[in-house]
């Protein structure tokens, strides 16, 4: 955690660093209080169940099929609220091969979820597309399905031309721009 904070721009104090320190505090408190720490497989199961709660049976089954192709690391790396948001984004766009969702994360940072067919050089392609879309990447979580068919990637990014928070309209437009840039790449 300390190395993560030191590795980022010193002028960048934001919710991301706040969240890192909060997580460190909570885990330290659990250890000091000797509360049992859950196994990563239990955390993954809990987060998966939590992500499914708001959906009807058909959509739950669709998401269970999707989740079954991801390992525990995916669920341990993504917080429950992000998994719920990603799940809703997938359900809204389940007829698409390329799914892009954008949401405000902390202050002027954006969380970008991209689910796409896996291919050679995909990470490079996605980073170039985000750069071409006017974004600076702060963090990335890259996941490939167990069967190597699709990738479910999450980026934390900042718009390179301003520091303001994005409106819902801005986020939808950004999603469309990323999709367009992906297709044209």
Predicted regions, residues:
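Regulatory modules associated with amino-acid/nitrogen control
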Residues: 1-185
